[in-house]
């Protein structure tokens, strides 16, 4: 009977990644410095792009074991994006020490604390030690959530206030990505010492 009923179905709706697909995701586009780019167009020589990539692989629980990426599909896609950038740069620019493995970066910049993602906050944050005693919080999550938590936006040459003009540009790009069937994540950070708390997921850039 169930099979007969299924034969009459013309549309199946599902909100679970992997139900009807391969449970695999890939980073298609990145919006940085007021413009979009593909992962293979990014470079570790750009300080803004490099900082974004560090955010993507550090505030991330996916890992590589025996050449396979293991973990949440979204976080796995971010890890694969970093390798795509790194391998492409190896082929085209041969910049040596900049093209280091994500494992090396994770060892150089250790995770001190984390607040895992949950459906209420719609974001995930981790704290790291960069240079000496300097500590930084990396956050990723839903665009609308992080927009409300950010006070600045980073460009290659400057940090600008998150005013109505910047908010409108980001919202427009978010809508464009969504209309093209892409899942959209926002990334932010801030320097902060002391214990990592939910309250510190504010005042971000």
Language-model-detected regions and their locations in the chain:
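Conserved cytosolic headpiece of P-type ATPases
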Residues: 1-205
């Amino acid at each position: 009977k169930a099979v007969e009923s299924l034969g009459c179905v013309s549309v199946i709706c599902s909100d679970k990644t992997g139900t009807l697909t391969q449970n695999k995701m890939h980073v298609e586009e990145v919006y940085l410095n007021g413009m979009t780019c593909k992962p293979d167009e990014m470079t570790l020589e750009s300080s803004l792009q490099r900082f974004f990539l560090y955010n993507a692989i550090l505030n991330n629980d996916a890992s590589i074991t025996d050449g396979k990426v293991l973990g949440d599909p979204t976080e796995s896609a971010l890890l694969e994006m970093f390798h795509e950038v790194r391998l492409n740069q190896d082929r085209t620019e041969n910049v040596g020490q900049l093209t280091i493995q994500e494992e090396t970066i994770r060892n150089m910049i250790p995770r001190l604390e984390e607040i895992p993602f949950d459906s209420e906050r719609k974001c995930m944050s981790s704290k790291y030690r960069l240079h000496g005693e300097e500590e930084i919080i990396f956050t990723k999550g839903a665009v609308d959530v992080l927009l409300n938590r950010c006070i600045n936006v980073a460009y290659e040459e400057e940090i600008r206030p998150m005013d109505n003009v910047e908010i409108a540009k980001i919202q427009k790009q978010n809508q464009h990505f969504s209309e093209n069937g892409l899942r959209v994540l926002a990334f932010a950070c801030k320097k902060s010492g002391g214990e990592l708390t939910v309250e510190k997921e504010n005042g971000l850039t």
